[in-house]
Amino acid sequence: MSFAVVLAAAGRSSRFGETKLKKPFLDLAGQPVWLRALTPFLSQPDVSQILISVSPDEVDWFISTFANPVEEHSIQVIPGGAERFDSVQNALNAVSPNIEYIAVHDAARPLLTAEVVEQVFDAARIHGAAIPAHRVVNTLKRVVDGQIVETVPREDLWNAQTPQTFRRDILLAAYAARNEFPATDEAQLVERWGHPVHVVECPSTNLKITTQADFALAEHLLASS
């Protein structure tokens, strides 16, 4: 069964703060964040296509700056769109017709492991749709105007991660039915389309770098691993 990997790297990194580079392109312990996010897929024999979406004005810069890994891994660099879903859609349009499964992964999740990739791929083969996630452990409060209005039961709540992996026809149909629906990930689109999404329990260390504190934590976890 053939898999395509889509790395989403076209975001604005607005919550990360002032840096010369966007967070996927920063050096993290000797490697760019996006390449660390990709590496666990490279050991999967069924991965036959790799695409990364970047901002249109960064396409040439990306290909030039990261020429060695782009060439070595035959990475297709796709111009992104105005929003994340537009960027992923552009990449989906470029997926080879012989691909059976598509994995969408945040380029800012550099601590993904090959073990998690393998587990999610296996679940997608069985269920058609699968994501990694970890259980919510903190107490959650619903707050309105600075006041707690509800303590939210957390027993059935999970933090969704990526790579979110789907049978090709399922993901494409879910995207086709989006109609500007404000989903926050691919799994929500697939749920809305009507196909159940299987959850693979994975460690919380598969974090997404959103702030500089997240980056510092990723550095610490890599140094201590």
Label every model-predicted segment.
Residues V5-L7, I52, V104, A129-P132:
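Structural beta-sheet core signal
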Residues L111-V200:
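Conserved core of the sugar-phosphate nucleotidyltransferase
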Residues M1-V59:
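N-terminal glycine-rich phosphate-binding loop and ensuing alpha1 helix
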Residues N206-S225:
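Hydrophobic helical membrane-anchoring modules
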Residues L7, W34, A91, H105-D106, ...:
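Residue-level signal for inorganic ion chemistry
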Residues N98-R109:
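Short beta-strand-to-loop acidic/aromatic patch adjacent to the donor-nucleotide binding site
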Residues W34-I99:
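Conserved N-terminal catalytic core of the sugar/cofactor nucleotidyltransferase
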Residues V47, I99, R125-A129, H195, ...:
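Short, high-confidence coil segments that cap the C-terminus of an alpha-helix
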